[in-house]
Structures are given as C-alpha cells and as structure tokens.
C-alpha cells in the first residue's frame, strides 16, 4: 500500500457565510483535504498554520492521526481553532487517500449508529432559541419534520435570520404556540418529538419551563427535563462539546469518552459538515448545528452509505 505522506499544508483567506474565514488545505502525495475555520485574526491564523505547525508535519504519514495530532499539540500555537482546523484537514486528506468517508476512517467500517440532529427554528433578540428534537427512525423523517415546521412557521413569522431560524420578539411568549404545533405534528406523524430551549441561566430562573423537555444553559438550574450544560455537573444529562475549543480530533475523542464515562451524553455544537462524520465515528448521540448549515444533509448522506443504520435515542 502506498504511504500517504504530507507534502504541503497551506492556509488562505476565503469569504464564506458573509465572513472572512481561513481555509486550511493539506496536500499529500496522493490526496488533498481541507477545513474552513472562523477566527478573529485571519492573518495570524495563516501565519500559525504555514510558519509554525506545517513545518512540523511535512514528511509524516497523514493516516497516523494520533501521531499527527500529538505533533500539533507540541507546537507553540495556542489557538485551538487553528489546531482543530489542521487536524481535520489532515484527517480528510487521509480518508480521501483511502477513498473512504471520514467517518469510516475515524470510526471503522462497521459504524452504524447515527446521531439525532436538532436545530433552532425560532429565536428572539436575546438569542433564546426553541429547538424541536425528533426521535426518528430515519434522517429523512427529521428532514421532513423541519420542512413541515418551517412551512407552518412561515405563516406566522416573516423574518428568517442567517442561521435559518425565524425570529420573534420574546421566545417565552411563543412557547405555548410552538408546543401545540409540535404536539399536533407528533400525533399526525406518529413521531416522538421533544421541545428544547437554549437560553441563559439568569434568563430562565424565574420562567415557567413546564412545556420544555430539554434545556440548554451554562450551569445547572432547577428543571424537570433533560438538562444540557457547558461543563460536567452532577445535575447534567448532556454536556456541550465545541470542537474548535478542543484542539485536535484526538483530544476531542478523549473528552467525549470522558463525558460518557461520567454517564452523560456529549452534544456536538457547530456547523462544519465534518462534525457529522466525527459524531458518527465517536458515537456522539446528538448534534446541534444551525438549520442553515449542511450538517443535517451530511448525516443524511452518511445514512445512505451504511448498512442497517440506527439513529440514537435518549
């Protein structure tokens, strides 16, 4: 088998999602892979990639992701977004060299479990967000639910933000309406659908949350449903994972397993389609991208490529 050797890693500014971002490209002797990251200082990120990290990786095998990630961690770069961007671009180059999807490269050929994918559909000016969470038998069921929900919501709300969610003045005034809508769809489609809320601890502490099944806040609050927090707490059911804060794919793998060892569920937040592959590879049960991202579609694509797919439930 041909060795897959890293020959060049480069970075450049790109305009994507109405912002200047940085594209990191890894070229091997037989393949190419890339990732696009969002950073505060693109010029500094490009310098970190090309002048600090890239020279340490040239000449090494892209397929040895653990070793590559260890080299990344040994550099002087302390920006985890840059580190993760390079880690993903190398992993993509490696999977492309083997002509297999990224999820199979990271998780193995027998991977069959898919995550639930849930996105906000309604948000207010304070970024409080309502999230329908579907326990479905197929990703297509989730896709169809969002199509139906957005169609119904279009009759009551006129503005859609850049993330694909409809906007309102106060999300807490809209909870009964969305709860009723979801309950109607549950009965019509015979689906198990939870209603989630993403907010702040100080915002929800005096609110009526009796119609909410799943709550995302920074720290624990008194709540009877599923609780998702920024860090690991005894009261938590879910813990947020932001890949670009982890450093590398390998570091994220260990953190995800640490969360699971505590009896909790990790939730990957982010809009990179690579996160769909990482979630499938590492058996993460829940993905939280924006509706306008390509993540749900990427999980749908993955579903079509595996035998007997099974969507996680909680």
Curated annotation (Swiss-Prot):
Source domain of life: Archaea
Protein name in the entry: Uncharacterized protein MJ0198
